[in-house]
Amino acid sequence: MVYDLERTKGVLWLENFVMLALTGGEGPEDSLASFLTSFIRQGQLRIVSEMSLEQLEVMRRLVPGFVEHFQIISVSEMDTPTSLRIFEYFNQYTNRTININFSQKALELSYVLLDRFVRYESFPGKAIRFLQTCANQAFLANRRHLDVPDVIGYFSQQTGIPDFLLRDDLLIDNESLHRFFLARIKGQNHVIDKICSIIKVFKAGLNDPNKPVATLLFAGPTGVGKTATAKAISEYFFGIGQKYQPLIRLDMSEFQHPGQIYRMIGSQGKLVQHVREKPFSVILLDEIEKAHPLIFDALLTVLDEGMLIDDLGRLADFRNTIIIMTSNLGGTQRSSLGFKSYQGHDFEADIRAFFKPEFYNRIDVFLIFNPLDEITIRAITLKELNEVENRDGIKQRGLKLF
């Protein structure tokens, strides 16, 4: 191959540049990249290829010095008009080859959704992949025309994002929204009002696009429904029993020591991996006060810019996440779990005294959960008993708990 290219003065196009470092012997020194280095240095071989910035770093790490023999040309992402023109060309191609046609509004919506929710890839590549998948699924379903509802359905199916968040209607039934949370959260009406407001702001697209959807801190004694509220928010967006499990729950007591930090925010960390796999998620950081202080410093970037870069330089995008932190500061006595003896306690003062101002000030909403009175506890008990009684194993046996 090298002889033919040198003789004809041809140019070698490599589709997968990283494979040069992975093909050959057991180590990098025996790889195909090392073998070709001398030919490239002497001008006997001319190569053109393409790769992402992440792949470039991998090549530099696997075969030091090899990439430096190439002239690197940075290609920026296409602007909106150019991307839409490529959409139209692709639509003409699918119409000609498999008789699938996208409406103009469907193409424009595809761009908007991909730009907002899919941020690890660039245009037009991510658009072509998405439209190709839509066209293939429509072809298998014997459909020939795709409009806005079809694009929303396929996008929701591929990303796990609820379709009602993707539709353009801005109105949310306020009564049904409150009713949903009232059925799941007892004795915390002020919390429900604030959560409903956050959801309506997000649905209307009025939240800051360069930050997480919302950053919430739930404070109060143990057993008043802080974790249950986070689960209810996740259930509202995604439902129960779905294949896509969007609630990312981390017990912060597992990250108390400096050596444990990378288990959360490193390249193999729980939080980074979950967010990269599920960019639209509800993140629950349980008992945040137990985490090592260095984690608070790392979270500053997440709360302020909606981004986190791991130790390999890879980006984790938090701009479509809801971050919920719970804290028991000031409410750790076990003698009265969530009862009225905590009435009047200044939980906010405890939180302010514990966290640095730069961390506390980046929290969007600080919610103090009320202690539970006897009537509320009775209602919660009946609700839990009803759920147990309705389990399949109990119903099949015809058992009654009360």
Short names for language-model regions:
Residues 1-402:
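AAA+ P-loop NTPase nucleotide-binding core of proteostasis motors
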